[in-house]
Amino acid sequence: MSDFTVEIECEIDGRWIGEVVDLPGVLAYGASRDEAVAKAKALAFRVLADRIERGITVADL
């Protein structure tokens, strides 16, 4: 569950955006491609931890 697929794209203004494919709405901006990916993965872990804390079943990703 720790190997997330992150789609990345460079915005017109030069910022990078990374979106975790298996978790809709989990996306993050970064100044570089690597930063956007790292931030998106970190956010994905936070979202999963929150779901677990609230007793929501987390399917294998």
Which residue stretches match the model-derived regions?
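N-terminal segment of the canonical double-stranded RNA-binding domain
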Residues: 1-15, 19, 23, 27, ...
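Central antiparallel beta-sheet cores of small beta-barrel/beta-sandwich binding domains
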Residues: 29-33
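Short, charged, surface-exposed hinge/linker loops at domain edges
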Residues: 1-5, 34, 38-61
